[in-house]
Amino acid sequence: MVVWSLFDDNAMSYNEALKEYDWVQNYSIGIIEHKEVENYYKIDLSCFNVNLIKELSKLPKPDVIIASPPCESWSYAMLIKNYRYITQDSIKITNYKDFMKENETLPFKQDFFKRQRTRLLGESCALGVVEIIRHFRPKFWVIENPRASKIWDYFQNFLDFQGIKNFANYNDWDNTYSKKPTCFYSNIDLGIKLGNVKSSIKWSSVSGYKNRSSIPKELVKYILETIEFRRKAQWTY
């Protein structure tokens, strides 16, 4: 099974989990240099990379694409939100005037132009993921982001990229993680069960992008094994 793990360049959660399977040929892809990691490729996965499809075409065609695009710009947790709403008809983005008005009420001021760079990066990566999946047409695909992320509205309403929302809590899979309600958007039902486990770890206490972007190994393995089960089931028909 050939797997492309997109944006797997910080915590490298997919690489760490998938290397345990001898029947998986995983290719982790991102923008951070990892010369010591086998089958890692440094590629800009955003739609700003005009050679994106050409560069990825050099790799074996994927059976599975799993991706964790940057989530910061889509977050509901932002004090000043980038997106007011995303519908099938329109996208409303917080403009400069409204941003500065809200900024006046905050104890820690935010930079409008820095925020726009973050927004454009997030949007370009979301576009890149969908372009990749639609071009290479893997049998299975999974995209991870916070459950409350606006990226799901962007996929469904702006890009007409439909899928199934599979919800998970990280502490159900590893008690060293915070709850971190997450969605794994996919073309299949992954059958993830939500537990009732209380976490002793608060999300606010998790520091550093690497730690915040980490995914429990057992959850990644469960997703992959579910996909493999479905793949084998297809062979029997």
Where are these regions (language model features)?
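SAM cofactor-binding core of SAM-dependent methyltransferases
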Residues: 1-75
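Class I S-adenosyl-L-methionine
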Residues: 6-7, 43-62, 73-237
